[in-house]
Design a protein with these regions (language model features):
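Flexible, low-complexity junctional segments that flank or bridge functional domains
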Residues: 4-293, 300-309, 388, 393-406, ...
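Conserved acidic, small-residue-rich alpha-beta core segments centered on
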Residues: 269-443
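Active-site diphosphate/adenylate-binding microenvironment
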Residues: 1
Length: 457
């Protein structure tokens, strides 16, 4: 059991609870995970390997690290482990190396550091090594085993957490490179809330002049002097977003073109995404084609006796001359029997916005934001600018654990309506724009600039 003192969770977990919670994850994934045909692992064998590792953990931090290691084998962005909240908020376990990084052009670049490192860490320097190990090799060996990483452009935030956060006072030597020079800096992890950050001195991102007609936490609308409406949406979790945009419909209707910026939009409710997309679509429309696992145990029972099922991979099934029941039994044995579905979205928009449209996206465009991209790609002539989206959308099944954290298993996989292969790849832009370190230094938003140029040509 978990013991409590002063309202906080003690950091020991019984072996019985460790076994139960690991087993619960193993079982729930077996019968609910939506991508068994996409991963090449023996789930039962991995469970047996994880058992001794989990039992050997000394505290809740180590325990959840091992759970994360186990679940990351499923290689899906909607499947993962979350630590207990009080553990994540505790400097004892989640202190930070006092440097702030961002992935730019495939490298991890310094955007800020604690004041005491102002003269030792180069601003905009590139992280080259971690404890003497090449950074790419270190990330592959020490970070990727614990996180979803199939789309490397979409996991940079998780990588930075792995690199920077850890137990209080733990140390690391980071090697930075800039202008042909190398900087080795020994650092220790400290309480992130007490770090005094340096100002990078870079200008804020330049924006086209114009009038802001809506400025809320999760949505902003600006009409540029050239008559382009820029709609920035940071989340589709907020159910009030469509209504707030609809409230500005008459002003939007006067625009010469439209930019919808969903870069960094972590998703939420695909119904809200549909409601925004509806302003650019006439009538009702198809939304979010998907598949979910179907389980009928009798077919699995029959399949267990089929010798001809052995050593046949899902890729080889098309070559086999099986009847429908045999095919169903094979798929049921491997939990890759899926039911397809397509949603029809009712168009509740106050009208149709006509004019050229650009959608801005990047590796942090995730989940319901990708559903928005899907609908816009399928039903409009919008131009998509930026970089690939995350490549993960679906319906996670959440379970809260007695030990204080939770896990999620993706139960529904979304399929691009235009036939594009997006699993762990994301939707591709029509116009790819790569962001550089110089863009950060100069305060340039090259993606936005490109979209404005396209719409005003």
């Amino acid at each position: 059991m978990i013991s409590f003192s002063g309202g906080k969770c003690m950091r020991t977990i019984s072996d019985e609870l460790k076994i139960y919670e690991l087993s619960r994850i193993w079982k729930d994934a077996e019968y609910n995970f939506a991508f068994w045909d996409k991963v090449n692992i023996d789930w039962d064998e991995e469970y047996k390997k994880a058992l001794p590792r989990v039992l050997a953990t000394k505290d809740v931090y180590e325990y959840y690290r091992e759970l994360a290691r186990f679940v990351s084998l499923l290689d899906d962005g909607h499947t993962g482990i979350s630590f207990p909240m009080d553990v994540m908020q505790s400097p004892e376990y989640f202190s930070m190396l006092p440097v702030y990084l961002a992935q730019v052009g495939g490298s991890y670049v310094v955007l800020s550091m604690a004041e005491e490192y102002r003269d030792t860490i180069p601003m905009f320097g590139v992280l080259a090594k971690y404890d003497g190990v090449d950074i790419a090799e270190y990330i592959r060996g020490k970070c990727y085993p614990y996180i979803w990483h199939a789309n490397e452009n979409a996991c940079s935030k998780a990588v930075m957490i792995e690199l920077l956060y850890g137990r209080a006072d733990s140390k690391a030597v980071l090697t930075f490179e800039k202008d042909g020079k190398t900087f080795d800096v020994s650092m220790r992890r400290v309480d992130a809330t007490k770090i005094k950050w340096c100002d990078s001195g870079t200008p804020k991102a330049k924006t086209a002049p114009g009038e802001v007609i809506l400025n809320e936490d999760n949505v902003k609308i600006k009409i540029t002097d050239s008559g382009i409406a820029v709609i920035t949406i940071t989340t589709f979790m907020d159910d009030s977003v469509p209504g707030k945009i609809y409230g500005k419909f008459e002003e939007l209707r006067k625009a010469k073109g439209y930019i919808i910026d969903v870069r960094g939009n972590g998703g939420g409710n695909s119904g809200n995404a549909d409601a925004v997309a509806a302003m650019f679509i006439s009538g009702q429309f198809t939304s979010c084609a998907a598949e979910t696992q179907v389980y009928e145990p009798t077919y699995k029972a029959w399949g267990l006796f089929r010798e001809d099922f052995k050593n046949v991979s899902p890729e080889d099934v098309a070559k086999m001359q099986w009847d429908e029941d045999s095919l169903k039994s094979y798929r049921m044995c491997r939990h890759i029997c899926f039911q397809k579905e397509t949603n029809i979205a009712e168009n509740i928009a106050p009208g149709l916005l006509e004019g050229p449209v650009a959608v801005l996206m990047n590796g942090d465009t995730v989940s319901a934001a990708e559903d928005f991209v899907d609908v816009m790609k399928m039903h409009t002539k919008a131009t998509f600018v930026g970089s690939n989206t995350a490549g993960t959308s679906g319906q996670p099944y959440f379970v809260f654990l007695e030990s204080g954290g939770n896990y999620r298993i993706c139960t529904r996989r979304c399929i691009a309506q235009n036939g594009e292969d997006i699993y762990n790849k994301g939707f591709s832009p029509d116009v790819r724009v790569d962001v550089t370190i110089d863009d950060f230094k100069e305060g340039r938003d090259k993606v936005m600039e490109t979209a404005l140029e396209i719409l005003t040509e």
